[in-house]
Amino acid sequence: MVEAAVAEGWDVCVIATTAAEAGGFVDVPALEAASGRSVRSGWRRVGEEKRNPPPDAVIVASLTMNSVNKWAAGIADTYALGLLAEAVGLGLPVVALPFWSTALDAHPATRRSVRVLRDLGVRVLYGPGAWEPHAPGTGGEQVDGYPWGLALRAMGEASGGVGRRCVSHDPTT
C-alpha cells in the first residue's frame, strides 16, 4: 500500500506500534525504503524535533480487534492510538481497514466500537462489499489477499486525493 500511495503522490508517514515491530509484523526497512521516511512507533523525547509533517488524512491498516476497541473507548496508551484519537478530534479524514477473525467479531464490543468510530466520522471498511472477518486460525492465509487497495481508494474519495497521510500499521495491539 505504501508504494501505491507514493505512486499516487501521497507523502506517506508510517506509524507502527511497538508490538507490531517487536513481533515482526512490519518490515521496517521495506516501509522506510518505500516511504522515504523513518517508521515511527513511539513518542518523541522532550526537546526532540518533530520528524513528520502533520497529516492531512490517516489510514489505519491493519486495524485489530484490540485496537478498534481501545480507539473507540478513547484509550491512547500507544503512540499510534494517540495519533488516531487526535486525528478524529481534528476532523481529519480517517479510513480504517480491519483484520480480525469471526470469533473476535462475535464479541459485542467489536461491533459497538465500529459503530462508535463510524459515528465519529471514521470510514471503517467493514461489512459486505468491504472487508469481512476471516475464520479463526486462518489469519496467516488471509495476508496475501488483504485489500490494501480498498483503503487507498477510500482515502482518495474521502480526502479528494491530495495531502499527506500517516499510515498506522497496527496488527498486534
Tell me what each language-model feature is.
Residues M1-T173:
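A cross-family phosphate/adenosyl-ligand binding-site feature
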